[in-house]
Amino acid sequence: MTNRLIATKTHVLNQLCGFLREREMLPAIAFVFSRKQVELYASSITVPVLEFDSKVAYTVKYECEQIIRKLPNYLEYLQLPEYIKLVELLEKGIGIHHSGMIPILREIVELMISKKYIKILFATESFAIGLDCPIKTAIFTSLTKFDGHNERYLMSHEYTQMAGRAGRRGIDTIGHVVHCNNLFKPLSSLDYKTILNGIPQKLVSKFRISYSLMLNLLKNGQTTDFHLFIEKSMVHNEIQNAIKGLIHEKTELTEEISKKMKFIEVAETPRTICDELLSLNEIIPNCVNKRRKKAEKDKQLLVYNYKNIINDAARVNELNNLKIKCQEIDNVTKNTISYIKSQTDTICDILLNSNIIKPLDDTTQSNSFELTTTGKFASNISELHPLIISRLVNEKWNNFADFSTKQMIGLFSCFTTIKVSDEYKLTIENIDDSYLCYRIKEIENMCIEYNDIEYNNSLDTGIDYDNMIQYDIVELSMKWCDCSNEMECKQFIQTDVSDMSISVGDFTKSMLKIVTIANEFINIYEQSENTDTLYKLSLIERMILKYIMTSQSLYV
């Protein structure tokens, strides 16, 4: 029996950092596909990564403080545990970067990278896009990632984007890429080859014929022929390519049908006899008693009289299947050619039935439309489902007349995209406010209604109705409004927010999203005389953007 030594992640990473430092392969970026692991890996580094004569360890704390002092509420940031922990890492030449960080702290890391103070950066893949930094080595702590549904291997273009960070243009002649194979399960040679040298990502349009698109066209003066505008988009080119592919496929099928026909014409068994056998094969499984016995007897008689009938009938069956497939391609081609027109017409019908648009001329069956009052309201909404919200606000909620500002905040929080682990997921039953709960259920019902409409009409508007509403921070956001001083805010973040495993950065983004939604409604109500609703909406920003929950930036 042999002893097998299993290296811990901490040991592997420390050995690697020492190796890179000795061979002057720093600065490096280590890609980690988990926010929690980013901070754990960074904290586990104990070997020195800074140069022997580096002054970073003594000066970085002062420089960070000087940067933070640009903010009016800098003292609140200086006392944050997240800030203190980050500075401790920076003093060792280590940085972290992920989307769950407080935006200001993330910007500090980016500034420190540009100053070359960070020798090893632990980051998620979001850092691979859009940020310039001096990196010699790219480290992969894993070659798999969770894509929101399943754990999967990196795609070739994702790997290339991250690995391409190694080596600075015009400075380095070579970039190093390190795979920590002893930190993850071994891959097959085929999987490795696919990741390193797979098929490049195809450029696919994410353009959708949506309600917002149609509303914007109407808002900007277009009243008819909406499909003509959409045909200028990239999706039109994709449709044309799909049509070419279908035509090519039909041509190949037609040639194959022609070849089959020639064989059948010279076959020993007449075509009508083959069809009779195929018909018997279809009805025998569904027949019983006397009818089944008669059908089987007829089949045996045909097989006895025509020696090659089995093979000849098989060819006829193949021919029939090819003709069916050819007809299916014709139908798909027809639908594809008229896709844009049929989609825009269907959306127009939905907008008409939802009282969002009306015909320009009531006396004729015109295909020209204009926005109704509810439609004008909907055309100014982009953060939420324009049809559902405009109909509810105008037809049922009397322009938020019975909502308090806190209830509005709770309502808007349903449309934030915060991610909470399954063990902390909440449902509508967790909402204490009965009035707000009732209103949210109205939104749910309309989501079901429009989801069914789109499904029945084969529409693809790009709206994910299953995940459109979430209830995880409804109570949190309303409770946040009650925090009136720094101590209460700090305690709320360290208890209520932390207890749900929500990062301060994610909670900040959610509060900013609520403010964005509120500002959208403010722009709408500024054009009307509804001062009561406008006043309630104007209170939202000051109620939730406080303490470190702000839109401040060090780059401005």
Predicted regions and their residues:
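Conserved C-terminal RecA-like helicase domain
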Residues: 1, 8, 13-17, 31, ...
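Beta-edge loop/turn motif
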Residues: 33, 106-110, 114-142, 150, ...
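Conserved segment of the helicase C-terminal RecA-like domain
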Residues: 133, 137-192
